[in-house]
Amino acid sequence: MTAVRAPRRRAPSDGQGGFDFSRPDEIVCGVDEAGRGPLAGPVVAAAVILDPARPIDGLDDSKVLSAKKRDLLYDLIVARSHAYCVASASVDEIDTLNILHATMLAMKRAVEGLSVLPTLAQIDGNRCPTLSVRAEAIVSGDALVPSISAASILAKVTRDRMLVDLHERFPVYGFNVHAGYGTAKHLAALREHGPCEAHRRSFAPVRAALDLIR
């Protein structure tokens, strides 16, 4: 595993990678996650192999895009990428393994779930999961590498939709608004109602809420 740090800039829309026609043996996938920080819900990862013959304009770090733009790009990525896979690690796995190892597990599942085996996985951040293919960690990769940008969008949109579904089951917490992050509203609901089965009991604010009701 290697780690690369580069100046932050917007991901270019051209030269999107995936297949390198000058090196037909090289197939690159971008990998990113969503949901390491929230107090509730799974952590989600995506892996994407872009098709250079079907470029997607506007790819960027999902965090700087509006929800409307993310939804639009999500549909384009699903339609135009050569291969993609979205995977997750559950709340139970997060609490058992810890959030770092659960994130690596979700990333591994995403890469291994691709219908096309990549020769290189480019991972957002400074750590790589253990994979059967070469892996390269790229700091700020979600803003630098289009395939990682695409993965960040798939992971973010998928997880946000999961949290909307959780809101239907547990409406008192406002998961549809904050996606499980520790906002003031969420923390107040935790103190008032205690945690639900979707909360990560290994996270300190959730443990504190549990202590209040014991």
UniProtKB/Swiss-Prot annotation:
PANTHER family: RIBONUCLEASE H2 SUBUNIT A, RIBONUCLEASE HII. This is Ribonuclease HII. GO terms for cellular component: cytoplasm; ribonuclease H2 complex. Transmembrane segments: none annotated. Manganese or magnesium. Binds 1 divalent metal ion per monomer in the absence of substrate. May bind a second metal ion after substrate binding. CDD domains: RNase_HII_bacteria_HII_like. One of its GO terms (molecular function) is RNA binding. It catalyses: Endonucleolytic cleavage to 5'-phosphomonoester. It is an enzyme of class 3 (hydrolase). The keyword Nucleus does not apply. Residues 26-214 form the RNase H type-2 domain. Endonuclease that specifically degrades the RNA of RNA-DNA hybrids. A divalent metal cation binds at residues 32-33, 124. SUPFAM superfamilies: Ribonuclease H-like. Its cofactor is Mn(2+); Mg(2+). Belongs to the RNase HII family. It comes from Burkholderia cenocepacia (strain ATCC BAA-245 / DSM 16553 / LMG 16656 / NCTC 13227 / J2315 / CF5610) (Burkholderia cepacia (strain J2315)). NCBIfam families: PRK00015.1-3 (NF000595), PRK00015.1-4 (NF000596). Its EC number is 3.1.26.4. It is found in: Cytoplasm. One of its GO terms (biological process) is DNA replication, removal of RNA primer. The gene is rnhB. Pfam families: RNase_HII (PF01351). Residues 1-10 have a biased composition (Basic residues). Residues 1-21 are annotated as: Disordered. Keywords: Cytoplasm, Endonuclease, Hydrolase, Manganese, Metal-binding, Nuclease.
